[in-house]
Structures are given as structure tokens and as C-alpha cells.
Amino acid sequence: MSSLSVRFLSPPLFSSTPAWPRTGLAATQAVPPVVAEVDAGRLEPRVEEREGYWVLKEKFREGINPQEKLKLEREPMKLFMEGGIEDLAKMSLEEIDKDKISKSDIDVRLKWLGLFHRRKHHYGRFMMRLKLPNGVTTSAQTRYLASVIRKYGKDGCADVTTRQNWQIRGVVLSDVPEILKGLDEVGLTSLQSGMDNVRNPVGNPLAGIDIHEIVATRPYNNLLSQFITANSRGNLAFTNLPRKWNVCVVGSHDLFEHPHINDLAYMPAIKDGRFGFNLLVGGFFSPRRCAEAVPLDAWVSADDIILVCKAILEAYRDLGTRGNRQKTRMMWLIDELGIEGFRSEVVKRMPNQELERAAPEDLIEKQWERRELIGVHPQKQEGLSYVGLHIPVGRVQADDMDELARLADTYGCGELRLTVEQNIIIPNIENSKLEALLGEPLLKDRFSPEPPILMKGLVACTGNQFCGQAIIETKARALKVTEEVQRQVAVTRPVRMHWTGCPNSCGQVQVADIGFMGCMARDENGKPCEGAAVFLGGRIGSDSHLGNLYKKGVPCKNLVPLVVDILVKHFGAVPREREESED
């Protein structure tokens, strides 16, 4: 087991909608009880450490879900910690599929290493998810990822995710040991990025360059990622959580990080003249329930962000339920214990068992209008600008990545920044170089800094092209529907449209102005067809709120007229024929 070596020092970072019709509730806004009646035995930790790994105690194994049984059958992290991936990579898929354990290794346990087998749609091919704290990557890292996917031809591509991360596709198992080595050499890891682990820490994509930033989030997210993965060597204390767990550090009034949908969100706040963070906990999406994060009534100094993260993770790991998989996210535990009961369990796990109450207010301006990241914008550094590029539904090819890396080196500082809207920012560009950058073919032909207004806010998950859980195809359909809608109506203000292929909501439809969640529907003849549930009214920024279900089971072929109608009624869009007649 690797030892953890992280210095918990905070750098000097601090510086000074319409009402929607509701046909169904998309999110749970109910506040957990302050105190809940809980039997003392319920507070006994359900896991214990054995030979360096955290294991579910035998007395708590009745009624556990299949994934928990799989973890007990073989510890997933042994594939990384004890070289199991090397042996697995030498086996043929035929050999692997003949053995129950090996088959579950490639289908489930490899997710602890960030590898997802696409058995249903691309047998023998894997998606690899990285860790990219705060969404920052270098040109060298980008070139390496391009070299990986290029060898896979039409099966190889990469996606920008809604957690400021890279996912690369087309990977074959025999290449994995060499890929992992290459990732390490360029300062990347895929470790602990899937299944019951902490996902990529999200922050302000403008950290350190933002004219209006409250605090630079990048150093904090780097610390969080180093802690969570033990400097990319594996932190076994947090690889057996009841379910996945999301964290973000908020750095500006814009709330680019979407704190209301994270399990833990650090909200900048001053208390007694000291800079630190108020804490929100419990936000999540799932097919069963969507819940907005709630205040923990806790404040920590900037020096203590790791300590409180550790305490919250330990409370969740120790006490979270492991039965029905749809009721294992941290908010279910908060509901069961009550917010004060959960807080007390966190306090027990803090040094000296102390945790200050929240500052009266955080530093977020409540009436702040969220800024646009796409386009050319000045930085806080005189003479420098950043350029936000629109990446249509987040999809890039190997040649695109090489070109992006070249642009980052030629015009910037060799750095790219990914956003939760699946776009990319090139920072630190000398103003004298802007004209040349804007004239580059890649920006003219592929990744525009001035996309059409409806394309600008378009987000889409992987869809059933690659994902076995997706019910519908999303990326190509999102582009096609949006293109057709643009031909029919003129829109004068941004409208964010998100697509997700299934109720897991990787496309985060509940935060969109208009969201589309894949489902099976019935056409005019009553026959099953691909469809979508439509959501309206999601808000982001300082007035964040989850949207509501507007209409169920709309056949995909009927979405264009519905979207046109919504845009005209709720967003001031004008039909093209009317616009032309008025002109």
C-alpha cells in the first residue's frame, strides 16, 4: 500500500427566471430532518480495515447489492496495487469470458482503474476516464492522449465530460499497461475515476486568470485529487464507498462548478476575518431521485479542506447503506441521520472532534449574472486574454487534439482548460496574438469562438453509440435537432439544451433550460420508438435550481416542433418566416 504524502497548505489565493408549468417533479428539494431518531447500533461502522483494504463486515452483508458482493469476491484495487492488470492484459477475451472472476474483472472491477468495457456495443473496447483536477491539462498530455486514440482508427475518439475531464475511447485491454505507464509519464492518472470512488474535482475553469474570481480553485482541487488518489498511487481508505461521490470548490459568483449537484461543495466564506469555506452536502442525480445539496452548517478554514473532506468521506464510507443501489448516495444517509446527526458523525472524525458552525453568509453575490466562457475575454493579467472554444457536444478526434495542443503552445502557455459545458479554453494569450489565433483553420472550421447561439449551450452525454446504459443516441441527434430548430426560429438570448441517454443523467438535463432524457416512447401508431422526457427551468449560476419534468415520452421525431414551441412561448424566439416578413 502506498503511503500518502500531501502538504495541506493553502496558498495566498483569496481576493477581493420564468415560472415553468409542472407535470412532474424532477428534483427533491425537501430538506433532511435536523435530527432523526437513530438506534445507537446504526452508528457502528459497517467496514473495517483488513490487510490495507477496507472491507464490509460480515454482520452487515445480508441484503447487500450485487456490486457489494462483487467487491467482496475480489478486491478491485488489487488489479492496480498488486499487478493484476498486467496478468489480465495478457489473456484473450475468450479466456477471460470463460472465467466468472476474470469476466467480472473486465466488466466491473477495472472501473476502479478508470476502464469501462463497452461489452454491449463495442465488445473488447474500453472507455478510459482520467482524473483532471479543475479541468486543467497540458499540451504534452493532450498529445499523448491523441497518440493513444489515433491507433484505434474509427473506434478511437475523446470526449470532454461534464466534470471537466477527458474520456478516451477505443482502448483495447492488451494496451492498458503501456497506456497507464504513459499516463504516469505525462502526469496523468485514470485511477479511482469510476464506480464507488470520488470523481474528478471540479473548479472554476478561469482559476488564477479570472478578473472577478473570489478564490483560485486550482490549487485546492489539486490537493483534493492528490489526497483522494494518494498522489496517483491509490488511496485505499476511499476506494470502497457505498457509491460514487462528487466534489467541487467554488471560485466565482458564476458557480461554474454547479455546487448544488455535488456531494460536497466548498463555498467561499469569511468568518471572523478569516477566509475559508461554508459546506454544502448531498447533491446528486440518479434514476430514482435528484436532490439539491443542503447546508451542513459548517465552516472550515482554507487550511482544513482536506481534513473535512476526509471526515465526510469516512462518515459516508462507514455508515452509508449498501443495499438497494438506488438508495446508496450520500444524501440518503443524510436523510436517515438528519442533517445534525450526519454533522455529528463528521465531527467525530475531525481532529479534536471540532467543526465550526457556518459563517452567516458566503461570498457569492446572489444577483450575479453568469458570464459566458466562449469567445475572447480579458484576463486579470494585463495584456493577456483567454479564448473559449465551442466543442460541438464535446467530441474530438486525434487530429483535433494535436491541433489544440499546437495552438496552446503557439499562442498560450501550453495549457488547455476543460469546462463542464464540454468546451475548451486556451488561456494566457498575448493580445497581440489574438488576431492570428482567430484566423487559424481549426477555429474557422471546427471549434468556433463564435458559434450559433443555440449551439453554444448544447451538451450531450455519450449516448448509445458507446454506452450500454443509454436508451437513445444523443450526440448526433442533439446536433441534428438543434440545427433544424435554428432553421425554424430566431433566438436572441442563450438557451442551454442538455441531452442524456438515460435516467442516470450524465448529461445533467436537470440543470438545463431545456433538457432531454432518453426513454422509450410510442409513436402515433402505438409502436415503441426512441423518445425523450423533456425538462424545463433548470437554473445555474448564483440562483441555481434544478428543472422540472415538462413532458414525458415524446418520440424523438416529434422533438423539433416541441422545442420550437417552447422557445417561442418561453424564450422569446421568433419564427423565421415572421422575422423575414417583419424585416
UniProtKB/Swiss-Prot annotation:
Q: Which GO terms describe its cellular component?
A: chloroplast
The entry's family comment says:
Belongs to the nitrite and sulfite reductase 4Fe-4S domain family.
Name used for this protein in its record:
Ferredoxin--nitrite reductase, chloroplastic
Positions bound to siroheme? C506
Cofactor(s) in the UniProt record: siroheme; [4Fe-4S] cluster
Which is a Pfam family this sequence falls into?
NIR_SIR
Q: Which gene encodes it?
A: NIR1
Pathway named in the protein's UniProt entry: Nitrogen metabolism; nitrate reduction (assimilation)
What species is given as this protein's source?
A: Betula pendula
